[in-house]
Swiss-Prot record:
It catalyses: cytidine(34) in elongator tRNA(Met) + acetate + ATP = N(4)-acetylcytidine(34) in elongator tRNA(Met) + AMP + diphosphate. It is found in: Cytoplasm. Keywords: ATP-binding, Cytoplasm, Ligase, Nucleotide-binding, RNA-binding, tRNA processing, tRNA-binding. GO terms for biological process: tRNA modification. Its main location: cytoplasm. This is tRNA(Met) cytidine acetate ligase. NCBIfam families: PRK13670.1. ATP binds at residues 7-20, 96, 152, 175. It is an enzyme of class 6 (ligase). Catalyzes the formation of N(4)-acetylcytidine (ac(4)C) at the wobble position of elongator tRNA(Met), using acetate and ATP as substrates. First activates an acetate ion to form acetyladenylate (Ac-AMP) and then transfers the acetyl group to tRNA to form ac(4)C34. One of its GO terms (cellular component) is cytoplasm. PANTHER family: TRNA(MET) CYTIDINE ACETATE LIGASE. InterPro entries: Rossmann-like_a/b/a_fold, tRNA(Met)_cyd_acetate_ligase.
Amino acid sequence: MTITGIIAEFNPFHNGHKYLLDQAEGLKIVAMSGNFMQRGEPAIVDKWTRAQMALENGADLVVELPFLVSVQAADFFGQGAVDILDRLGIDSLVFGTEEVLDYQKIADLYTEKGAEMEKFVKNLPDSLSYPQKTQAMWKEFAGLDFSGNTPNHVLALAYAKAVAGRNIKLHPIQRQGAGYHSVNKDVDFASATALRQHQKDQDFLERFMPSVALFEQASKVIWEDYFPLLRYQILSNPDLTTIYQVNQEMAVRIKEAIKTAQSVEELVELVTTKRYTKARVRRLLTYILVQARENVLPEAIHVLGFTEKGRQHLKSLKGQVNLVSRIGKEPWDAMTQKVDQIYQLGKPSIAEQNFGRVPIRIETN
């Protein structure tokens, strides 16, 4: 049987995600971000709600990406997620993208010339941002051009790099309907960005979200809910360079900007430069919010939920893969668990995220 992996945030889960799961074959394993997203923002609803949405709409098994995989630039995000899915035995990776190319060929190219390609990136001037360097590399070695707004394509290339040399086939699915950042309401498939923006528009949600009741019942947060905490962390920390990935230049800019910024968005605007993209600045602010430090990634994989089919697969992995289904006295990943406690501070109504929580079981699919 085919075992298909999907890397996702489901922030929130919408019809485009359901379409992706419908297109996937065999047993479907989702490696999903926890409570903070790749581009450095809190999830609109918590990881358990999002895992349940996925399980109700075609996923067989949902596992959690640790914080230091979730909140990373595309390459590290892709690498960390593929590592986890590889250990869970996937033989194909399905993903949505704006550009359907022969990503398999790109993965093979990276298998062959990876060292040379990384050397090329290293030698590019530091005035370029990391995404610009990566794009220059793909242009040079694969002849790829980038139109501005294709974050899923950028992630797809990161997945191609991550599967290089592994026995995993890539299956791109043409992204349906609205673009990633689109807030357009007159489309067949709305983007997660639009759903977050129109979260109080009942008709809109019902049109584009398969698990709308779950979403409506859940506590919802936005970055601004954490702004007072973020300000406190910045103002009270005498040396921001002790925080993961914060260098001297960024520390100075952030300390200066917090004097006048009245919101997270304003802070991001003030700190962003040509070299430091908004997404990168948001990630740094997330690291500061949670006091992130360089840390080893957990050995074990945290299971958020499964169907009967998913449970059978987990049974077959017993003894080969270290799985955690209940976080108790033994932590799974101390960093992620601390992050979840901070996530809960965004709204008093957010439930406990780890202790005593057991995987969600969906009986029928």
